[in-house]
């Protein structure tokens, strides 16, 4: 697909892998040739890392595109997309690079393919600096499906830092268009639940301690809440390596979902891991928003593509979200307005409304 190349500065704003994910996904969807320069320029190890490379190669293969400059450490790539196709698409970070971030870049694209897709993703399922697969399934999935599509996510094996080795299969069918969403009514918290897991050689007591510490911490602030956090020993054949972590979800009367999560590290006791997740959840409940700080930016591309006006209510707008908006406006020409919520209750809490006039992307194949 010919046309002028869209020029992206990979060092601005969030300045990391997210710029690559948003810009290449939109380039692929819109058939716009792309050049990204200064990739991760401000990071301690600039340029492409293995997980970025596997994401780029996956997008290239999704649309039989051309990709130049794609090697570890490269700070500039050019990408020329062709037609998006369904079928089986595979990506392997060969490290603990996050499978959830591979989903972020590929899912919007295969929604506009000609036929159903199966994404076979390998890497870390529960990795630092990325959503945990539990978050993707328990929070991201039910909310993003409000845009008018469904997907199936089958966790074959869990993989942890530093080895990775996780495996996830995502199945989804294409859509004609995406519906806009209106997520502005939070309602009140009706239940709090989650899972605290251990895998490999770690004793089950660690899972129980994480769950108990998290529940205690939550009950201090939300006194009458029923907190149901299940301790789980992952089956040996479904987890690769040693790890522990916890995710806690708060669900509201209007179907909003908020999460707090934490992963264990060597030398950090179980109570501290549990309390870390609980405090993150409580922080996300203190603002008046309808999505938590980690869901904000993951919805921006879908809002940009949708056919109509979408609105979401958030707490403080994160740098990741500001970055996604910047590139959705630059590349897709979607129009965003971010303003403080006018609701009196929200004003004191730093609550915002993100509104987007989507471009009404239509699947040419359907």
Curated annotation (Swiss-Prot):
Catalyzes the conversion of 3'-phosphate to a 2',3'-cyclic phosphodiester at the end of RNA. The mechanism of action of the enzyme occurs in 3 steps: (A) adenylation of the enzyme by ATP; (B) transfer of adenylate to an RNA-N3'P to produce RNA-N3'PP5'A; (C) and attack of the adjacent 2'-hydroxyl on the 3'-phosphorus in the diester linkage to produce the cyclic end product. Likely functions in some aspects of cellular RNA processing. Function plays an important role in regulating axon regeneration by inhibiting central nervous system (CNS) axon regeneration following optic nerve injury. Its main location: nucleus. The keyword Nucleus applies. It is found in: Nucleus, Nucleoplasm. One of its GO terms (cellular component) is nucleoplasm. Keywords: ATP-binding, Ligase, Nucleotide-binding, Nucleus. The active site is at 320 (tele-amp-histidine intermediate). The gene is RTCA. NCBIfam families: RNA_3prim_cycl. The lineage of its organism: Eukaryota, Metazoa, Chordata, Craniata, Vertebrata. GO terms for molecular function: ATP binding; RNA-3'-phosphate cyclase activity. Signal peptide: none annotated. The keyword Nucleus applies. GO terms for biological process: RNA processing. It holds the Pfam family RTC. SUPFAM superfamilies: EPT/RTPC-like, RNA 3'-terminal phosphate cyclase, RPTC, insert domain. It catalyses: a 3'-end 3'-phospho-ribonucleotide-RNA + ATP = a 3'-end 2',3'-cyclophospho-ribonucleotide-RNA + AMP + diphosphate. ATP binds at residues 104, 131, 294, 297-298, 320. Gene3D superfamilies: RNA 3'-terminal phosphate cyclase domain (3.65.10.20), RNA 3'-terminal phosphate cyclase, insert domain (3.30.360.20). CDD domains: RNA_Cyclase_Class_II. Its EC number is 6.5.1.4. This is RNA 3'-terminal phosphate cyclase. Belongs to the RNA 3'-terminal cyclase family. Type 1 subfamily.
């Amino acid at each position: 697909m010919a046309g002028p190349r869209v020029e992206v500065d990979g060092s601005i704003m969030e300045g990391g892998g997210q710029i690559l994910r948003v810009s290449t996904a939109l380039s692929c969807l819109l058939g716009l040739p792309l050049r990204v320069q200064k990739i991760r320029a401000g990071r301690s190890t600039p340029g492409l890392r293995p997980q970025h490379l596997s994401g780029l190669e996956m997008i290239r293969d999704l649309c039989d595109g051309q990709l130049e400059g794609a090697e570890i450490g490269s700070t500039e790539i050019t990408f020329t997309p062709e037609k998006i196709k369904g079928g089986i698409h595979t990506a392997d970070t060969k490290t603990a690079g996050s499978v959830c971030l591979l989903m972020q870049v590929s899912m919007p694209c295969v929604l506009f393919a000609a036929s159903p897709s199966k994404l076979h993703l390998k890497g870390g399922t529960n990795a630092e600096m990325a959503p945990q697969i539990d978050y993707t399934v328990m929070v991201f999935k039910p909310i993003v499906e409000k845009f008018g599509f469904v997907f199936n996510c089958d966790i074959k094996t869990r993989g942890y830092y530093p080895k990775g080795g996780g495996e996830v299969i995502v199945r989804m069918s294409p859509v004609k268009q995406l519906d806009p969403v209106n997520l502005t009514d939070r309602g009140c918290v009706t239940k709090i639940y989650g899972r605290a897991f251990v895998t490999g050689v770690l004793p089950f007591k660690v899972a129980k301690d994480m769950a108990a510490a998290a529940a205690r911490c939550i009950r201090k602030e939300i006194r009458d809440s029923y907190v149901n956090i299940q301790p789980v020993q992952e089956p040996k054949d479904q987890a690769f390596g040693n790890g522990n972590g916890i995710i806690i979800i708060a669900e509201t009367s209007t179907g909003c979902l908020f999460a707090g999560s934490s992963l264990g590290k060597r030398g950090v006791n179980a109570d501290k891991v549990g309390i870390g997740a609980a405090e993150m959840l409580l922080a996300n409940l203190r603002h008046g928003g309808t999505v938590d700080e980690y869901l904000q930016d993951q919805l921006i591309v879908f809002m940009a593509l949708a056919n109509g006006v979408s609105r979401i209510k958030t707490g403080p707008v994160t740098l990741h979200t500001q970055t996604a908006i910047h590139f959705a406006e630059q590349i897709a020409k979607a129009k965003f307005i971010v303003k403080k919520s006018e609701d009196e209750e929200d004003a004191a809490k730093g609550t915002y409304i993100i509104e987007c006039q989507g471009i009404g992307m239509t699947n040419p194949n359907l």
